[in-house]
A protein has these predicted regions:
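A short, histidine- and acid-enriched strand-loop-helix "catalytic/donor-clamping" loop
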Residues: 80-84, 101-120, 135
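Donor nucleotide-sugar binding/catalytic pocket of nucleotide-sugar-dependent glycosyltransferases
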Residues: 126-171
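Nucleotide-sugar-dependent glycosyltransferase donor-binding/catalytic pocket residues
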Residues: 11-15, 164, 191-194, 207-213
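Conserved donor-binding/catalytic core segment of Leloir-type glycosyltransferases
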Residues: 4-6, 175-196, 201-205, 217-218
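Nucleotide-sugar donor phosphate/pyrophosphate-binding loop at the beta->alpha transition
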Residues: 88, 111-128, 165, 169
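N-terminal subdomain of nucleotide-sugar transferases
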Residues: 1-44, 70, 206
């Protein structure tokens, strides 16, 4: 089966992206399917803003060509809810569904998923996209509730992408040896941004410090 999958560059030297990592993981672990990567999204060193318009026009033409060359391919469209994506991706998705293509939209969070205030024009775009008769994939039940209740999405499937934290409930203070030479090591791997859980990480570290757990944060 041919599957067209969108994401930024899969080369980590050109782009540090959670979507790229997820896409590479999907392709690498699903060898029975023929994935066709369509690169969409700027590289880390590319200029943004108005400088992107000529490149986007070129990409839109390439998108039409890609769909024409693979008429039977289904589409796995990765969709972060950021301002650049909200202004770009609906055009690409609209072309695909107007052509009657089978498509699943994989939502990857983003600033405007949980933002208390969304500019009116972006909110209208989001409600328009999620109002389409398309299947949407999200990464948690909380995100599913947000899409259905706030944006009116009807066909949403949750595929959690985090580790099972049930064992954390069994963690008890007396089981931890307060050995300053062997503090608890906390690792963070990802982009340093407010919407990547920085506030939650800070609160967790403050709580550990207050309860006198020795720890070391590695970023």
């Amino acid at each position: 089966m041919d599957i067209i999958i969108t994401s930024p560059s899969l080369n980590p030297k050109e782009n540090v992206s959670g979507i790229s990592s997820v896409t590479q993981f999907i392709i690498s672990n699903n060898r029975k399917q023929n994935y066709l990567h369509f690169e969409l999204g700027k590289k880390d060193l590319d200029k943004g803003g108005w400088h992107r318009i000529p490149a986007l026009i070129k990409k839109y033409r390439e998108w039409k060509k890609m769909l024409a060359l693979h008429p039977d391919a289904i589409i796995h469209y990765n969709f972060p809810l950021s301002k650049p994506s909200l202004l770009r991706d609906p055009w690409f998705m609209r072309y695909a569904w107007k052509k009657g293509r089978k498509m699943v939209v994989h939502v990857h969070g983003g600033l405007f998923l949980t933002a208390p205030h969304i500019p009116g024009y972006l909110l209208r775009i989001m409600k328009w996209v999620f109002g389409q008769d398309l299947p949407f994939i999200v990464l948690s039940d909380m995100e599913k509730d947000i899409l259905t209740q706030r944006f009116g999405a009807k066909n949403v499937v949750s595929l959690p992408n985090c580790v099972d934290l049930s064992d954390a409930a069994a963690f008890e203070k007396e089981q931890v040896l307060h050995d300053e030479s062997k503090p608890l090591r906390i690792g963070y791997l990802g982009r340093i941004e407010p919407n990547k859980g920085m506030t939650e990480l800070l609160v967790a570290c403050q709580r550990l410090k207050k309860e006198k757990y020795p720890f070391k944060l590695v970023i």
